[in-house]
């Protein structure tokens, strides 16, 4: 046997995790990865919800002045934007939580890769012809890790070395770990386009019937969203079911269609 069972599992797990392939056994990485998926799903949903609320608010302002008899209907139509400020706060918090979770995940991955590389160096003489293949796999794993950190702005300058030697890999991992130690997380501000708060009049008046239909769509989507996110939360300790992810994708797709419908109404003149 070229590798001891412990070292072989550790190295393969490092490669597996860095390439985002689901590990066969439940472990810390699996739990962190599931939590990260949940954070990202919630973040994406809140971003869509806030975009919807801002667009809906803009449409609501374009309504013609209603008579006193229609005030009850107007109150009902305002329901989708009643918690808009709470949505903003919740989105800011989930963005921070998502970033922190991903950082913990990547730190754990970096430590595992470092230990796996050291384990590999201890048994390199036993590997023979497959040594170069294993080193290339670990090197590629480190590059994937660096790319993810670069996207998060948590690494100053990724390694450009194409050398897959033990020394080169350990040097890259040291650079990665040093960068992770230096960086401090800061809360993410919600990026809003200037047009989202525009008070300019709409090109056309939107009737209450149109908004009523949109409100029905909104309520249905919210009910589905709560069901899907609850399903994900209940499965945190295991792999996230593919059918749940598929349902989430369908929800997000329908949400995008609804956003497009709102955008078209806003752009019509």
Swiss-Prot record:
Polar residues composition bias: residue spans: 193-202
A Gene Ontology biological process term: mitotic cytokinesis
GO CC terms, sorted: cell cortex of cell tip; cell division site
Residues the record lists as Phosphoserine modifications: 200
Domain of life: Eukaryota
Keywords per UniProt: Phosphoprotein
Residue stretches of biased makeup (Basic and acidic residues): 181-191
Region (Disordered): 181-203
Protein name as annotated: Uncharacterized protein C16E8.08
Annotated organism of origin: Schizosaccharomyces pombe (strain 972 / ATCC 24843)
């Amino acid at each position: 046997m070229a590798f001891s069972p412990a070292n072989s599992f550790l190295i393969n797990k490092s490669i597996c995790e860095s390439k985002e392939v689901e590990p066969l056994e439940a472990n810390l990485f699996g739990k962190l990865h599931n939590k990260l998926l949940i954070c990202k799903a919630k973040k994406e949903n809140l971003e869509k919800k806030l975009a919807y609320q801002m667009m809906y608010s803009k449409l609501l302002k374009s309504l013609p002045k209603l008579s006193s008899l229609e005030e009850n209907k107007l109150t009902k139509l305002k329901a989708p934007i009643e918690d808009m400020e709470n949505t903003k706060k919740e989105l800011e918090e989930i963005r921070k939580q998502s970033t922190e979770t991903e950082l913990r995940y990547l730190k754990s991955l970096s430590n595992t890769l470092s230990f796996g590389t050291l384990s590999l160096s201890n048994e390199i003489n036993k590997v023979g012809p497959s040594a170069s293949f294993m080193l290339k796999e670990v090197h590629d794993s480190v590059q994937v890790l660096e790319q993810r950190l670069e996207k998060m702005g948590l690494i100053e300058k990724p390694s450009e070395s194409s050398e897959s030697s033990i020394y080169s890999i350990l040097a890259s991992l040291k650079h990665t770990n040093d960068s992770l130690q230096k960086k401090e997380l800061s809360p993410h501000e919600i990026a809003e386009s200037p047009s989202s708060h525009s008070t300019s009049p709409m090109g056309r008046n939107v009737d209450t019937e149109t908004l009523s239909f949109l409100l029905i769509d909104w309520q249905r989507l919210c009910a589905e969203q709560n069901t899907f996110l609850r399903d994900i939360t209940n499965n945190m300790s295991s792999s996230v079911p593919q059918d749940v992810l598929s349902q989430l994708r369908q929800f997000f797709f329908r949400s995008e269609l609804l956003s497009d419908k709102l955008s078209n109404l806003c752009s019509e003149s």
